Amino acid sequence: MEILVPGRATLAQLEAIWREGRPARLAPEARPAVEAAAARVAEAAAGTAPVYGVNTGFGKLASLKIAPADTAQLQRNLILSHCCGVGEPMPPSTARLMMALKLLSLGRGASGVRWEIVALLEGMLAAGVTPVIPAQGSVGASGDLAPLAHMAAVMIGEGEAEVGGRRLPGAAALAEAGLAPVALGPKEGLALINGTQFSTAYALAGLFEGWRAAQAALVISALSTDAIMGSTAPLRPEIHALRGHAGQIEAAATMRALLEGSAIRESHREGDQRVQDPYCIRCQPQVTGAAMDVLRMAAGTLATEANAATDNPLVLSDGRIVSGGNFHAEPVGFAADMIALALSEIGAIAQRRVALMVDPTLSFDLPPFLTPEPGLNSGLMIAEVTTAALMSENKHMAAPTVTDSTPTSANQEDHVSMAAHGARRLGRMVENLAVILGTEAICAAQGVEFRAPLATSAPLGAVLARLRAEVPRLGADRILAPDLAAAARLVRTGALARAAGLPLPAL
């Protein structure tokens, strides 16, 4: 169970909810502020002054006054009318993270919902009731309306949810877990669907996967350096200190530790006629380290957003209920674009290392395509082509999405963030990157084994052994698709990087 303190939840807590499926609830100290804001909304609902989302219509219809007798129906209609999502459903782990993020936003005490709403979300997370949420339909302002409406629909006994491995109507799913639908009070429907939690959940998932890929890239690239008999001189600490970028310094230090004690490296420290290695070997800290810095910048933005009140209107500390624009997911869109750039570049330089290792004119005496009998066998020829295809896909997907605004809702919502699909694409990019890195690991392992009797370092030897437990050495040609998939799994689970047994940079 993760106890979330609104405004102070950590990325580690959010990753545990996403990766391990932990339930979450708000810290008890959040309750007084939540209930105070709810009381203020109830007071406004009983008055005559127009308050957006309490006794008015929504969006372009905000100028239309709603009769007091219709305010409950207003909130229910809002949820039903906004359930317009299409496409495949969100992954359950990401949907649960979205629910936890909504808890955090409501817990800031600025949304005006009753504690009953918070308790139902907590109960759904604890009982494993996960709304089925179509993943397409949000433009990231005014919040992630359609996907969050599908979440809220289950809370009022509509929509669909998964529970116990079964997909059920919303009311039945709640009943299965011993929960009851809630009747929405003033503003509560709006508070549930206004916010950036869908986009932020997807962006955080991409961040967590991206960081794991960056760690794997450091380990695998060190193995590639040994396979190619690359120089470790460019890893010297002073080079990186003279530039000063934290990620670059960490990347170089990690690679130095990984390569320490390599007999392959010692064998060509003297007398090597190559003056400089290609950039994909020599500039690894500068590229992967820069990607790490970018991922950390995105992490800072997303950590702030995860703890933010992104509702509209907001109940301020002086009791005023004021319309604003915190629902606009521009920060999330920028963060998603940054993550996409980092993923693309990690993959781009990894693909060049794959190309280097299979090319006999560049690989420093490795056999063509890393096969012991070239000609009769094609070896890793087409595995390299696959990495090129995936690299190109990722380059295409790395184009910014946040710049692609379009007006919606009769021009009332005339600038939007497109953060939702900017964050969603990260999942596919990570899948591609894992295959690129896994294929690099296969090539590097094959290359290092061709250097026998010389051996790599102890940490990298352990990495090679972990890979070989899943992917046998390539001799005669065989179907390689299962090998590429197995290596990609080792990247995505973190097992390959952990096998080195050394500390790796932390997010």
From Swiss-Prot:
One of its GO terms (biological process) is L-histidine catabolic process to glutamate and formamide. The modification 2,3-didehydroalanine (Ser) is found at S142. Contains an active site 4-methylidene-imidazol-5-one (MIO), which is formed autocatalytically by cyclization and dehydration of residues Ala-Ser-Gly. It catalyses: L-histidine = trans-urocanate + NH4(+). PROSITE patterns: PAL_HISTIDASE. Pathway: Amino-acid degradation; L-histidine degradation into L-glutamate; N-formimidoyl-L-glutamate from L-histidine: step 1/3. GO terms for molecular function: histidine ammonia-lyase activity. GO terms for cellular component: cytoplasm. There is a cross-link at A141-G143 (5-imidazolinone (Ala-Gly)). Its main location: cytoplasm. Its EC number is 4.3.1.3. Keywords: Cytoplasm, Histidine metabolism, Lyase. It is found in: Cytoplasm. It holds the Pfam family Lyase_aromatic. CDD domains: PAL-HAL. NCBIfam families: hutH, PRK09367.1. Belongs to the PAL/histidase family. This is Histidine ammonia-lyase.
